[in-house]
Amino acid sequence: MPELPEVETVCRGLNELTSGKVIKDAEVLLPRSLASPSSVDEFLSNIRGVIFGEWQRRGKYLLGTLVKESGEAAGWLGVHLRMTGQLLWVNQSEPLQIHTRLRLFCGENKELRFVDIRTFGKVWCVPPKTTPETIITGLKKLGVEPFSDDFSDDYFTTKLNGRQRNIKTLLLDQEIVAGLGNIYADEALFKSGVHPTTLGKNLKPQQIEQLRIAIIEVLETAIEKGGTTFSDFKGVTGINGNYGGTAWVYGRTGEPCRVCGTSIERLKLGGRSAHFCPRCQA
């Protein structure tokens, strides 16, 4: 699943390429990709003729403001890529990808395509005078953004203190820190020297501080490299992310640790894989 760096990469690409573009027409190829409104006719009626404004990221969600030609607010377009979703800015004449679910035609031979192999991704068209949180209910449950001032040592300590769950599982909880996923949780735990099985309640103040800083640094580095592509992720122009080749531990089971040379190990925690160095994270 695309995580914060991948979604942020897409967000920046959308701001660069779609801002000010008019959605002249649209085509829904898979109606169940529409979370709201579920009616294809209603979705098309709401989206035709509006203009893309600014895109923002909230956790792993993308929110694009929509405006009318008069400048009046026209709502929001929300997207969650889930496991395999892609938003691609392409020439309209380009052959259609087999898993294309939605096409937004923007004139000048350009279109924004939503491509999704496993069909878990969702699209929302939020009407004006309605907040995105009202329609996209998952937004209400999100924790703080890791780049915000709210992500402080005090906040993190409050969320981890007394918790009986292991830290890897806690980092994947979107109600604690929004946007973290399997890849960057492993990377941050390695960088902070914390073993993934450590219970939240057993983390010392210094470890919590180091982990918080590591989360921010790892995410910043991944964004600089355009995210990670291990299977399906691509930026809006179809370019793969480059973080994977420099990962500390994720996807490197059996390979030598880049710091100490010990073989990277993997274990299952809560149904998810955790990659770690048994020496650096002892």
Curated annotation (Swiss-Prot):
Its cofactor is Zn(2+). The active site is at residues 2-3, 60, 272. DNA binds at residues 99, 118, 163. GO terms for molecular function: 8-oxo-7,8-dihydroguanine DNA N-glycosylase activity; class I DNA-(apurinic or apyrimidinic site) endonuclease activity; damaged DNA binding; zinc ion binding. Keywords: DNA damage, DNA repair, DNA-binding, Glycosidase, Hydrolase, Lyase, Metal-binding, Multifunctional enzyme, Zinc, Zinc-finger. Its EC number is 3.2.2.23, 4.2.99.18. Binds 1 zinc ion per subunit. GO terms for biological process: base-excision repair. It catalyses: Hydrolysis of DNA containing ring-opened 7-methylguanine residues, releasing 2,6-diamino-4-hydroxy-5-(N-methyl)formamidopyrimidine; 2'-deoxyribonucleotide-(2'-deoxyribose 5'-phosphate)-2'-deoxyribonucleotide-DNA = a 3'-end 2'-deoxyribonucleotide-(2,3-dehydro-2,3-deoxyribose 5'-phosphate)-DNA + a 5'-end 5'-phospho-2'-deoxyribonucleoside-DNA + H(+). It holds the Pfam family zf-FPG_IleRS. A zinc finger (FPG-type) spans 248-282. Involved in base excision repair of DNA damaged by oxidation or by mutagenic agents. Acts as a DNA glycosylase that recognizes and removes damaged bases. Has a preference for oxidized purines, such as 7,8-dihydro-8-oxoguanine (8-oxoG). Has AP (apurinic/apyrimidinic) lyase activity and introduces nicks in the DNA strand. Cleaves the DNA backbone by beta-delta elimination to generate a single-strand break at the site of the removed base with both 3'- and 5'-phosphates. Belongs to the FPG family. Monomer. This is Formamidopyrimidine-DNA glycosylase. The lineage of its organism: Bacteria, Bacillati, Cyanobacteriota, Cyanophyceae, Oscillatoriophycideae.
